[in-house]
Swiss-Prot record:
The keyword Cell division does not apply. Its cofactor is Mn(2+). Its EC number is 3.1.3.16. This is Protein phosphatase 2A catalytic subunit B. SMART domains: PP2Ac. Gene3D superfamilies: 3.60.21.10. InterPro entries: Calcineurin-like_PHP_ApaH, Metallo-depent_PP-like, PPA2-like, Ser/Thr-sp_prot-phosphatase. Its main location: membrane. Component of the Sca1 complex, a regulator of cell motility, chemotaxis and signal relay. The Sca1 complex is recruited to the plasma membrane in a chemoattractant- and F-actin-dependent manner and is enriched at the leading edge of chemotaxing cells where it regulates F-actin dynamics and signal relay by controlling the activation of rasC and the downstream target of rapamycin complex 2 (TORC2)-Akt/protein kinase B (PKB) pathway. Mn(2+) 1 binds at residues 55, 57, 83. Disulfide bonds: none annotated. It is an enzyme of class 3 (hydrolase). It comes from Dictyostelium discoideum (Social amoeba). The gene is pho2B. It is found in: Cell membrane.
Amino acid sequence: MNTSTFNLDHCIEKLQKCEILPESTIKEITDKMKELLISESNVQEIRSPVTVVGDVHGQFYDVLEIFKIGGQCPDTNYLFLGDYVDRGYHSVETISLLTCLKLRYPSRITLLRGNHESRQITQVYGFYGECMRKYGNPTVWKYFTEMFDYLSVAAIIDEAIYCVHGGLSPSALSIDQIKVLDRFQEVPNEGALSDILWSDPDPDREGFVESQRGAGYSYGKDVTLRFLQNNKMQHIIRAHQLCMDGYQTLFDNKLSTVWSAPNYCNRCGNMASIVEVNEKLERYFNTYAAAPQSLSNKPTLDTNKELPDYFL
């Protein structure tokens, strides 16, 4: 690695000012990131205390707010549950910063894959267009979407709390099955890899029912409790769904949804949260509103377009 062109501390400092990195540097950091991620398992083992972060969707100034509230990396151990890009105005800066932080402090930050870490989805919901506007070509989008194929898909805190972007799959009811999935690919339209990134809990259903999102399933309390029992887990923390209060708990407090993008799409008026998990595995939801810069920042995307139903 040529340190004269690639200095992580310099990159992080630049990104914290919301300045994009050169295309050549993006290639270097994504190549290094793939080298790092290939050594990580599908299901990462994490020790408490750890702060868990849900969807951030390119809301860069709110990501900076997360580090102010939760503590800077590496002082705080972080687990991000995916959906770093699309919809927000600064997806490039957001994923660039998180990638650089992962490279700089690999044991203090874990990045999981969300359903938006996908070529197909990012071509529709903003990241591709943002890369084209900011770089004039799709090369940076290609670098990052290739890197997305390497991200882990789940994590376990202290062998007790299962963490994933979306949830459960009828095709992978044991964590051992998730450990052997081939994750090094574009998110498929169906199957276990797709399901765990796309599925949602539903308190009004039992079992698995095909999701109205067009991918994944709605899953009920019964299969959730069975999954926990069979895998000797105590709780599930997941993201993927907008929560007006920033979080939601379901199924006798056995499942939590954490949402970390306040005032989503600059119009939803919702709160956001991060989950602090201590050594006793107690969960504290730290809620926050949109950062002032996010409220005043001029959009680079057309947020007047209709949001797809699955998004809200």
